[in-house]
């Protein structure tokens, strides 16, 4: 499948899905990718790639001169990300690694321009610390969080380690759903998008 648009936000229904594997929804994905500020040729790391929605869209943004690494601890997620990358024709500039962060990060002999951390890991402080070691100066990090504890832990870790220009945005999306008498707006869970830079 080809995505011929220059903006992120591939509709969720175009991705192959598995109910057991989380996915960054299209509106949140578009905002997270805009906070990453990806450029052609960038090297991007997606920690907790899940369905591969961020991995795929980041790959479209970096182009053939860039590379996107997707990491997940679940083999099913790695396989699903691979299938979605094949579906959108971007498998050629994606590297998929099965492993759990933060431990797996020290085995990657690369530096990254952009790092995305999805979901809510209990090890968020350790993941952020390990990310500091592999992100280039001027690189951006973006974290999606659902839990307030994740937000608190992420912000305190980012400040302590030295990330600058920290921002946090709370996003509440409601999608229209047809009912017998009209359209009702169904709210999704609030998501916090945290971003910062390595000086």
Curated annotation (Swiss-Prot):
GO terms for molecular function: cobalt-precorrin-6B C5-methyltransferase activity; protein methyltransferase activity. One of its GO terms (biological process) is anaerobic cobalamin biosynthetic process. Pfam families: Methyltransf_31. Pathway: Cofactor biosynthesis; adenosylcobalamin biosynthesis; cob(II)yrinate a,c-diamide from sirohydrochlorin (anaerobic route): step 8/10. CDD domains: AdoMet_MTases. It is an enzyme of class 2 (transferase). Its EC number is 2.1.1.196. It catalyses: Co-precorrin-6B + S-adenosyl-L-methionine = Co-precorrin-7 + S-adenosyl-L-homocysteine + CO2. Keywords: Cobalamin biosynthesis, Methyltransferase, S-adenosyl-L-methionine, Transferase. S-adenosyl-L-methionine binds at residues 24, 48-52, 72, 101. InterPro entries: CbiT, Cbl_synth_MTase_CbiT, Cobalamin_biosynth_MTase, Methyltranfer_dom, SAM-dependent_MTases_sf. The keyword S-adenosyl-L-methionine applies. It comes from the Archaea. Belongs to the methyltransferase superfamily. Archaeal-type CbiT family. This is Probable cobalt-precorrin-6B C(15)-methyltransferase (decarboxylating). It comes from Saccharolobus solfataricus (strain ATCC 35092 / DSM 1617 / JCM 11322 / P2) (Sulfolobus solfataricus). The gene is cbiT.
């Amino acid at each position: 499948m080809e995505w011929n648009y220059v903006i992120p936000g591939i509709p969720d229904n175009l991705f192959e899905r598995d109910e057991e594997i989380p996915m960054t929804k299209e509106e949140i994905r578009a905002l997270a990718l805009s906070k990453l500020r990806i450029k052609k040729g960038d090297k991007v790391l997606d920690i907790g790639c899940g369905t591969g929605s961020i991995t795929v869209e980041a790959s479209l943004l970096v182009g053939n001169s860039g590379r996107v690494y997707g990491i997940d601890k679940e083999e099913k997620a790695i396989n699903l990300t691979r299938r979605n990358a094949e579906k959108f024709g971007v498998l050629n500039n994606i590297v998929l690694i099965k492993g759990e962060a933060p431990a797996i990060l020290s085995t990657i002999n690369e530096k990254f321009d952009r790092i995305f951390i999805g979901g809510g890991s209990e090890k968020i402080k350790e993941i952020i610390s390990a990310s500091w070691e592999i992100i280039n100066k001027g690189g951006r990090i973006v974290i999606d969080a659902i839990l307030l504890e994740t937000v608190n832990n992420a912000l305190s870790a980012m400040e302590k380690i030295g990330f600058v220009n920290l921002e946090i945005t709370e996003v509440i999306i409601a999608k229209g759903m047809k009912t017998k008498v009209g359209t009702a707006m169904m709210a999704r869970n609030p998501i916090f998008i945290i971003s910062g830079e390595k000086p």
